[in-house]
From Swiss-Prot:
Organism (species): Rhodopseudomonas palustris (strain BisB18)
Complexes and interactors: Heterodimer of HisH and HisF.
Reaction it catalyzes: 5-[(5-phospho-1-deoxy-D-ribulos-1-ylimino)methylamino]-1-(5-phospho-beta-D-ribosyl)imidazole-4-carboxamide + L-glutamine = D-erythro-1-(imidazol-4-yl)glycerol 3-phosphate + 5-amino-1-(5-phospho-beta-D-ribosyl)imidazole-4-carboxamide + L-glutamate + H(+)
Assigned EC number: 4.3.2.10
UniProt enzyme class: lyase
Gene expressing this chain: hisF
Name of the protein described by the UniProt record: Imidazole glycerol phosphate synthase subunit HisF
A GO term from the CC aspect: cytoplasm
Length: 258
């Protein structure tokens, strides 16, 4: 049986972590490499870096962060933000990223997913989906894709889009509920399960974690294969080990370091 993954996420701007981190053993809470080393030592299964500056002028800074993290850490790294071309993916992988996350560029040019998967293998291509619940014209609701940090509505159905990008070669979906992100009310379980049940690749649930039970819920009821969280770990509310122990007690298969 697959092991459930617990994945902390770091938002990076101009080479610095922009959301506060409260690890007591960090010398510099704004240094993403130090934060990554702490998460690696704590037993995180993977780490997600999101370059929220996401401009080519800042790419060199992020590449240095990825390179230094890869040299210091054993856990796999997923890096996203501003990835628009095959060359962007190439330099991130060469710098030490294990997987690269594509978001807005995949929405505007679907064939980019296919090109990336064919060149680098689907195992390292993650498509990030930011979805929000919207009203249908004739009544009812659906989940719609938003891009550019949630500012731009696309009118694209999230479930249909997930199926399409997987058919083009996406090896994993990073699914964020914009309705739940930052609320600490738990994952959007109907959204997560709808996407996870519609594709044959792993789905990472993201957005809304406030308790350890929320992590369990994302796997058990959301049918995700991994859970991503930020603030509950960054602010020292829970440790990675506490999260994993809680999930083990709930009957989920976890990788536990000795």
């Amino acid at each position: 049986m697959f092991k459930v993954r617990v994945i902390p996420c770091l938002d990076v701007k101009d080479g610095r972590v922009v959301k506060g981190i409260n690890f007591v053993d960090l010398r510099d809470a704004g240094d993403p490499v130090e934060a990554a080393i702490a998460y690696d030592a704590a037993g995180a299964d993977e780490l997600c870096f999101l370059d929220i500056t996401a401009t080519h002028e800042n790419r060199g800074i992020m590449l240095d962060v990825v390179r230094r993290t890869a040299e210091a850490c054993f856990m796999p790294l997923t890096v996203g933000g501003g990835v628009r071309t095959v060359d962007d993916i190439k330099v991130l992988l060469r710098s030490g990223a294990d997987k690269v996350s594509i978001n807005s560029a995949a929405v505007s040019r679907r064939e980019f997913v296919k090109e990336a998967a064919e060149k680098f293998g689907d195992q390292c291509i993650v498509v990030a989906i930011d979805a929000k619940r919207v009203k249908r014209g004739g009544g009812g609701e659906r989940w719609e894709i938003f891009t550019h940090g949630g500012r731009n509505s696309t009118g694209i159905d999230a479930i249909e889009y997930a199926q399409e990008v997987v058919s083009l070669g996406a090896g994993e979906i990073l699914l964020t509920s914009m309705d739940r992100d930052g609320t600490r009310q738990g994952f959007d379980i109907p959204l997560t399960s709808a996407i996870a049940d519609s594709v044959h690749v792993p789905v990472i649930a993201s957005g809304g974690v406030g308790t350890l039970d929320h992590l369990v819920d994302g796997i058990r009821n959301g049918h995700a294969t991994a859970v991503l969280a930020a603030s509950i770990f960054h602010f020292g509310e829970f440790t990675i080990r506490q999260a994993k122990d809680h999930m083990v007690r709930a009957g989920l298969p976890m990788r536990l370091d000795p």
